[in-house]
């Protein structure tokens, strides 16, 4: 069992229940999935950029990403409908907790000039989104083998009813807020 999952079941659930004043342990919010998204700007001109993004995402997430395609043509961006423009991965279960553990314990401390994540990035329903500017903060990505620096979006989807519950959940996991 993943370290964070066992900590959540043994300690964090009761701690969050007491903090939020919930009556039943089943009302305690939990993380349902983590979605990683990497948009590749120049993928329409150079197909090798997308291959590099897929390789980086596979190393970071531990599973092969699905390639996302443009929904409609945009002349200003020089893309057409159905052209590949990025990749994404949805993590659930054990892999989700393993990724969250690596994110909090290893990747976030390696971010340069990091002062904590904004507590305002919740969506109103307890889900949290954050962006990472460089994929090299993850130790799985070899610095010598990358062709260029890429950022990625991370969305943590929770079963929380509102932002207060989502913030309490992520704070219990040790998420560094400002």
Curated annotation (Swiss-Prot):
Pfam families: Ribosomal_L5, Ribosomal_L5_C. PROSITE patterns: RIBOSOMAL_L5. Keywords: Ribonucleoprotein, Ribosomal protein, RNA-binding, rRNA-binding, tRNA-binding. GO terms for cellular component: ribonucleoprotein complex; ribosome. GO terms for biological process: translation. InterPro entries: Ribosomal_uL5, Ribosomal_uL5_bac-type, Ribosomal_uL5_C, Ribosomal_uL5_CS, Ribosomal_uL5_dom_sf, Ribosomal_uL5_N. HAMAP family: Ribosomal_uL5_B. Belongs to the universal ribosomal protein uL5 family. This is one of the proteins that bind and probably mediate the attachment of the 5S RNA into the large ribosomal subunit, where it forms part of the central protuberance. In the 70S ribosome it contacts protein S13 of the 30S subunit (bridge B1b), connecting the 2 subunits; this bridge is implicated in subunit movement. Contacts the P site tRNA; the 5S rRNA and some of its associated proteins might help stabilize positioning of ribosome-bound tRNAs. Part of the 50S ribosomal subunit; part of the 5S rRNA/L5/L18/L25 subcomplex. Contacts the 5S rRNA and the P site tRNA. Forms a bridge to the 30S subunit in the 70S ribosome. This is Large ribosomal subunit protein uL5. It comes from Psychrobacter sp. (strain PRwf-1).
